[in-house]
């Protein structure tokens, strides 16, 4: 699972996901890509599940690039704990994804293989996505 090696601070504010993604919204490495259409937090487990699904389907052919990285810690309080006494401890990592962001890229395979592999990965995501091809 992906997570930062070290961070400056252990805990972060939740923040807001306003607007669309201006960075990371173009295909850079491969020929085919999976693009987010909704804003959401995507956990490191979901990213890894999508990557594994694509890798299994493509077998040895092709190359896969993961364009998002989970750099935001999400804190969770223990169950049946009263309010107060500070913020919970960091439990897992998420990537903040806005509409338009490229999640995965793929190259070195035919369009049919890429479309099938990316659609399997799209099923692992908690948001609506679309398959796009580089010009």
Swiss-Prot record:
Bilayer-spanning residue ranges: none
Record's subcellular location: Plastid, Chloroplast
Keywords: Chloroplast, Plastid, Ribonucleoprotein, Ribosomal protein
Gene3D superfamilies named in the record: Ribosomal protein L10e/L16
Matching SUPFAM superfamilies: Ribosomal protein L16p/L10e
InterPro entries cross-referenced by the UniProt entry: Ribosomal_uL16, Ribosomal_uL16_bact-type, Ribosomal_uL16_CS, Ribosomal_uL16_dom, Ribosomal_uL16_sf
Cellular component, GO annotation: chloroplast; mitochondrial large ribosomal subunit
Gene Ontology biological-process annotations: mitochondrial translation
Molecular function in Gene Ontology: rRNA binding; structural constituent of ribosome
Subunit-level organization: Part of the 50S ribosomal subunit.
NCBIfam families: rplP_bact
UniProt similarity note: Belongs to the universal ribosomal protein uL16 family.
Protein name: Large ribosomal subunit protein uL16c
